[in-house]
């Protein structure tokens, strides 16, 4: 196994990009794409072939959970980094939708659009990493959160990192007479895996420093550690034990099922950590229920309270 090669990874795990990269070995059976030794079986429903049906249920469940989290974040009107966290969650929804498209065969691997959707998926996951790092630095309050300047810096940074990864993926997948092609995937591996792993590591270290030296709240440290545990467990189940899981489950699910589930739990822990270290700055909580005003400009509750003494 050479550095940057997906040959060994794709032999064990049915990653979406495995259908658009080639084995390093020129004598491979397929001109393009690496078929894993074991992968989840497909299901035919209404003359439509659906791949990774178990993974699809996890994605739909993840979308519901993220919508609930977004509702809770929007309710914390004055919390630090509220808009930035909402942007992170919107990116997470985009990533799950793109994963549904490439995992479940909405765009078949044989179609010309498949490579573009895989590039979008990798680009969104990269943008999600840089957005998470920005949210982590925001908690140190080096700059004002929620302002137009802060949001535009976040948007431009995420779009730039998305564009870089997207372009690297497309050039690698399409082989447009460049130094990159579907057999030379070292650059793709560095951008999609190595650099994003470094970004996530910096985020985790920064949040541990924030909790230990600034907040001194060890309950929130537990949320960080749980998030790291779920993320690492998902990567291990996806890239190491996928083949064994697939064979043990009789091809019904593989490592992608458990990896996607662990990613959803990771999103939940990221939100929980943010929720624990932030609070509303209002003196009184803000309710979403509007109070009716009578013709004298007095609310119903105010009228009842004043009538007790006057």
Curated annotation (Swiss-Prot):
Protein name per UniProt: Chitin synthase export chaperone
Bilayer topology term: Multi-pass membrane protein
Protein location: Endoplasmic reticulum membrane
InterPro entries recorded: Chs7
Organism from which the protein derives: Candida albicans (strain SC5314 / ATCC MYA-2876)
Regions that span the bilayer: 50-70, 86-106, 114-134, 151-171, 194-214, 221-241, 257-277
Assembly mode: Interacts with CHS3.
This protein's UniProt keywords: Cell wall biogenesis/degradation, Endoplasmic reticulum, Membrane, Protein transport, Transmembrane, Transmembrane helix, Transport
Keyword Transmembrane: yes
Family under the similarity heading: Belongs to the CHS7 family.
Swiss-Prot/TrEMBL GO biological process terms: cell wall organization; chitin biosynthetic process; endoplasmic reticulum to Golgi vesicle-mediated transport; filamentous growth; filamentous growth of a population of unicellular organisms; flocculation; negative regulation of filamentous growth of a population of unicellular organisms; negative regulation of flocculation
Biological function: Chaperone required for the export of the chitin synthase CHS3 from the endoplasmic reticulum.
Taxonomic superkingdom: Eukaryota
